[in-house]
Amino acid sequence: MYYSSGNYEAFARPKKPEGVDRKSAYIVGSGLAALTAACYLVRDGQMKGERIHILEKGPTAGGACDGWKFENVGYVMRGGREMDNHFEVMWDLFRSIPSIETEGVSVLDEYYWLNKADPNYSLCRATVNRGQDAHTDGKFDISDKGAMEIMKLFFTPNEELQDKKITDYFDDEVLSSNFWLYWRTMFAFENWHSALEMKLYIQRFIHHIGGLPDFTALRFTKYNQYESMILPMVKYLEKAGVQFHFGVKVVNVEFDIKPEKKVAKTIIVEENGKKDKIDLTENDLVFITNGGCVENSSMGSQNTKAEYNTEIKEGGGWDMWRKIAKQDPSFGHPDKFCSSPEETNWMSATIETLDPRILPYIKNICKRDPLSGKVVTGGIVTVKDSSWLLSWTINRQPQFRSQPKDHCLVWVYALFSDKEGDYVKKPMREC
């Protein structure tokens, strides 16, 4: 293994790989990771764009990084990303992706200048009693015993955490603390989720701890992340000649498996109801998005509930991964992630304010003008006494370029979609 330190090698451009002009790439999915792979193949791999194929079952790129206005429904953002200084791969890439708003600058330039001029921080992290400040006051409110429970998990070998739950390591010393309120709502953790996942998150985001209570560690984009991140990447790839194949489901990837190596040989696809196959050679690279956090998502509206459908459908990432995993156990165990929807589902909604009388109530909580064009809530505001454990956030407005100037978009999400509401007396998933 070769190691380097410092930034000596960070800015040196790689030589053109030998034989790259004979190689092709097939990328399954078009989310942030898939588009990143394509961008690196173009920039660093110097592969010809027309030899890069992105296979996407939906009509647009972006995966979970979406932002769209649907006719008769309105603006929809299923989720959002919270970025920080240590997204090294992302910042390395976006320094090379041109802005689609400002000529001559990169996406990273825009992002850096925005967050330097308008730094992110929250003035109200949680509420109780219908909008009153819960006065978490930047405190973790955790005992020495609770801190030791977190430390114990942090230092437990991964092998010992297989099939263990968070509640196997944390008791009320942690689970009733402000720390857990901050953490679980920021990262969408349930008490019964994987202890190993919890440990890996702590390791990955340990530098967040100081900025956890007020979100000072976070950075956000100007618009929704489809317009701010995905669209510039798509434009960059299209200009390079990368081939986008929308409406193409990848049903399976078949491997030639030998003791010493495993090689993808065939991609089984479906387009317009017809199945076909792509035969692969030693000059073909395959990048697979296996599973996905919005794979089985459904959409409702003001008058129609989102369908709660737990079926794993053919042509989706989870079903494809199952078929790949059946070929060899080293390809993992997808059912660990997708077989318990009651324990893993959550719900989000995008709310557009049409009545200006709502805005003063929002301002009273977040202590900022929602239509100022600057940071508003600075991250989620958690309704601490909500049966749904509901949180909401307002990023810089407008969130869409097409958004009316006097309208505000609020993103809402909750962890307990099966619980009866405090005001609306039915489960969130029935709303």
Please name every model-derived segment.
Residues H208-R219, N283-L285, N290-C431:
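C-terminal segments that line or cap access tunnels to active or ligand-binding sites in enzymes
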Residues Q203-L285, N290-G291, N303-T304, N309-W318:
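Helical element adjacent to the flavin cofactor pocket in flavoenzyme catalytic cores
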Residues I100-H207, R219-F220:
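Rossmann-like flavin
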Residues G58-E82:
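Conserved N-terminal glycine-rich FAD pyrophosphate-binding loop of Rossmann-like flavoproteins
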Residues M1-A25, R43-R51, K69:
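Extreme N-terminal leader/targeting segments of oxidoreductases
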Residues R81-S96, S122-L123:
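Elongated alpha-helical scaffolds
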